[in-house]
């Protein structure tokens, strides 16, 4: 949603429905065209293109852009609502238990949305940033245990090579 919100903010700034934002220049530079003119390209690029705009929001927010800060706050609040709902279900029978939530994906790496999310989750929730891809959990389940560091290293190397090949 962050990339989509960035596009919306840029288009709203363009037509006067929203505040000016440094996202406009950043998004248009990435798209290689004015956002208004790039709409057909955005549709062709789909979710992957839209998601690729999220880092621009984090960079603009770090630079003090109020619109970007608002995008991060709204998305963090949405995620925190999901965490609160899960927490309420998982700790229903044991309110003193710790609810561990594993966060995976680029949004949670190197700052991203993590700080805004962490300040919004209830006490007793432990946020864990995954340093492995989600498929690693399936790998561990299939092997029946947490693999040794050597096996983990080979898995990660093979995964990185496959990801590079698929994205190349």
Positions of predicted regions on the chain:
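Loop-centered beta-sheet repeat module
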Residues: 1-5
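ATP-binding/phosphotransfer module of carbohydrate and carboxylate kinases, centering on a glycine-rich
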Residues: 7-168
């Amino acid at each position: 949603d962050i990339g989509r919100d960035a596009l919306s903010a840029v288009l709203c700034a363009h037509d006067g429905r929203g505040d000016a934002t440094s996202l406009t220049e950043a998004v248009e530079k990435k798209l290689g065209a004015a956002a208004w003119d790039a709409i057909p390209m955005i549709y062709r690029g789909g979710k992957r293109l839209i998601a690729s705009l999220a880092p621009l929001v984090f960079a603009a927010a770090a630079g003090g852009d109020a619109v970007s800060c608002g995008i991060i706050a709204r998305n963090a609040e949405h995620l925190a609502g999901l965490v609160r709902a899960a927490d309420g279900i998982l700790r229903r029978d044991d309110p003193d238990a710790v609810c561990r939530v594993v966060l995976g994906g680029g949004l949670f790496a190197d700052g991203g949305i993590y700080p805004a999310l962490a300040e919004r989750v209830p006490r007793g929730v432990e946020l864990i940033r995954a340093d492995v891809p989600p498929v690693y959990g399936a790998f561990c389940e299939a092997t029946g245990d947490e693999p040794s560091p050597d096996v983990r290293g080979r898995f990660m190397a093979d995964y990185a090579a496959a990801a590079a090949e698929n994205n190349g």
